[in-house]
Swiss-Prot record:
PANTHER family associated with the record: 5-HYDROXYTRYPTAMINE RECEPTOR, 5-HYDROXYTRYPTAMINE RECEPTOR 6
Gene Ontology MF, one: G protein-coupled serotonin receptor activity
Membrane side Cytoplasmic: residue ranges: 53-62, 123-142, 210-266, 324-440
SS bonds (residue pairs): 99-180
Protein name per Swiss-Prot or TrEMBL: 5-hydroxytryptamine receptor 6
Regions of compositional bias (Polar residues) in chain numbering: 347-358
Organism the protein comes from: Pan troglodytes
UniProt feature, compositional bias: Low complexity: 362-371
Family: Belongs to the G-protein coupled receptor 1 family.
GO biological process: adenylate cyclase-activating serotonin receptor signaling pathway; adenylate cyclase-modulating G protein-coupled receptor signaling pathway; cerebral cortex cell migration; chemical synaptic transmission; G protein-coupled receptor signaling pathway, coupled to cyclic nucleotide second messenger; positive regulation of TOR signaling
A Gene Ontology term for the protein's cellular component: dendrite
Free-text function comment from the UniProt entry: G-protein coupled receptor for 5-hydroxytryptamine (serotonin), a biogenic hormone that functions as a neurotransmitter, a hormone and a mitogen. Also has a high affinity for tricyclic psychotropic drugs. Ligand binding causes a conformation change that triggers signaling via guanine nucleotide-binding proteins (G proteins) and modulates the activity of downstream effectors. HTR6 is coupled to G(s) G alpha proteins and mediates activation of adenylate cyclase activity. Controls pyramidal neurons migration during corticogenesis, through the regulation of CDK5 activity.
Record keywords: Cell membrane, Disulfide bond, G-protein coupled receptor, Membrane, Receptor, Transducer, Transmembrane, Transmembrane helix
Length: 440
């Protein structure tokens, strides 16, 4: 987190003598801060353990989530407890040498969390707008290099300026006695805020807005493909059925409505993600710049805005997996749930594309069997096996019992935009119906 600016120069506090007095904050404030700290540490630890223990979640995209949850976990374990004591007592009550170290970790962990959010948006952007080239571009070594680059930038924006004293340039006033508030100059605040917040937030807005536009545009395309090629899908799967024009028309309308709801859900998802990010962090960084200019923000208000930014580390492990179907399923397997055995038995008993000896298998959807035409600027040229075809035909992938893939299959351009956070696919599952025995 960018240190609080102000006209005072030195970041080395003057320490009062004697033991610390009783905390000035109320019991409700202390209890609320303890709940925030416990929830932040528990939620991020749970999701890190979930990704590490569940093979279905070990893929390149979730590597960025592990980095995000690690930075948020460090905020909850390293940054929040001293900040709580500092807010309750009104002064720094820990060892004097820990003040500068804690401030550096504060800046590094919060900056790393914001930069990891930027990497996640970039990963979603590449996956949805260029799905055929995603695995060629976002390889595990490149993902690791991006994560290391984010943490290196966060460390350079925190430890290096504090150790070299760049934040003290141009100041000569003594510090406030007993306080651990890093007072920085306006140039340092502008540079640090731009590198760790304004540039990443601009990239996040750009990528998510592009995803939103693609979701709205391609939801209409998916609905038209679903309506126009339902009969072709039936012939591809060789599922005989009796034509019912009235029922098919109603089904087409329901499918179009469902696609519209999926696009709306994608829009709401983006709104929630962007809204929570800017609500928690934008007030703090605006207050940083205002304080550097006029020194007119009280310490109490600045503490409130600081904790509002900390709460972003509490919300990230709740908001992001909330829209990811794989996390929900893995969490149901990871945590004991009384309803899980009954739901699993009901799922096994339901008629679908299964045999009596093969176990549960994934159902076929329209996106797996329909030739989906790609726009002219698509990445169809990267498909070496297409043979110059203008469409992309994805066949159903049937897994053997107990077989699992480490990375999810590449989504098509039409379905990925609506399903950019692993929302349940919009296409109906096609199930074969047994043929009746002919009678004379």
């Amino acid at each position: 987190m960018v240190p609080e600016p102000g006209p005072s120069a030195n970041s080395t506090p003057a320490w009062g003598a004697g033991p610390p007095s009783a905390p000035g904050g109320s019991g409700w404030v202390a209890a609320a801060l303890c709940v925030v700290i416990a929830l932040t540490a528990a939620a991020n630890s749970l999701l890190i353990a979930l990704i590490c223990t569940q093979p279905a979640l070990r893929n390149t995209s979730n590597f960025f989530l592990v980095s995000l949850f690690t930075s948020d976990l460090m905020v909850g374990l390293v940054v929040m407890p001293p900040a709580m004591l500092n807010a309750l007592y009104g002064r720094w009550v820990l060892a004097r040498g820990l003040c500068l170290l804690w401030t550096a970790f504060d800046v590094m962990c919060c900056s790393a969390s914001i930069l990891n959010l930027c990497l996640i948006s970039l990963d979603r952007y590449l996956l949805i707008l260029s799905p055929l080239r995603y695995k060629l571009r976002m390889t595990p070594p490149r993902a690791l290099a991006l994560v290391l680059g984010a943490w290196s930038l966060a460390a350079l924006a925190s430890f290096l300026p504090l150790l070299l004293g760049w934040h003290e340039l141009g100041h000569a006033r003594p510090p406030v006695p007993g306080q651990c508030r890093l007072l920085a100059s306006l140039p340092f605040v502008l540079v640090a805020s731009g590198l760790t917040f304004f540039l990443p937030s601009g990239a996040i807005c750009f990528t998510y807005c592009r995803i939103l536009l693609a979701a709205r545009k391609q939801a209409v395309q998916v609905a038209s493909l679903t309506t126009g090629m339902a009969s072709q899908a039936s012939e591809t799967l060789q599922v005989p059925r009796t034509p019912r024009p009235g029922v098919e028309s109603a089904d087409s309308r329901r499918l179009a409505t469902k696609h519209s709801r999926k696009a709306l859900k994608a829009s709401l998802t983006l709104g929630i993600l962007l809204g929570m990010f800017f609500v928690t962090w934008l007030p703090f960084f605006v207050a940083n710049i205002v304080q550097a200019v006029c020194d007119c923000i009280s310490p109490g208000l600045f503490d409130v805005l600081t904790w509002l930014g900390y709460c972003n580390s509490t919300m990230n492990p709740i908001i992001y997996p909330l829209f990811m179907r794989d996390f929900k399923r893995a969490l149901g397997r990871f945590l004991p749930c009384p309803r899980c055995p009954r739901e699993r038995q009901a799922s096994l008993a339901s008629p679908s594309l299964r045999t009596s000896h093969s176990g549960p298998r994934p159902g076929l959807s329209l996106q797996q069997v329909l030739p989906l035409p790609l726009p002219p600027d698509s990445d169809s040229d990267s498909d070496a096996g297409s043979g110059g075809s203008s469409g992309l035909r994805l066949t159903a992938q049937l897994l053997l019992p107990g077989e699992a893939t480490r990375d999810p299959p590449l989504p098509t351009r039409a379905a990925a935009a609506v399903n950019f956070f692993n929302i349940d696919p919009a296409e109906p599952e096609l199930r074969p119906h047994p043929l009746g025995i002919p009678t004379n």
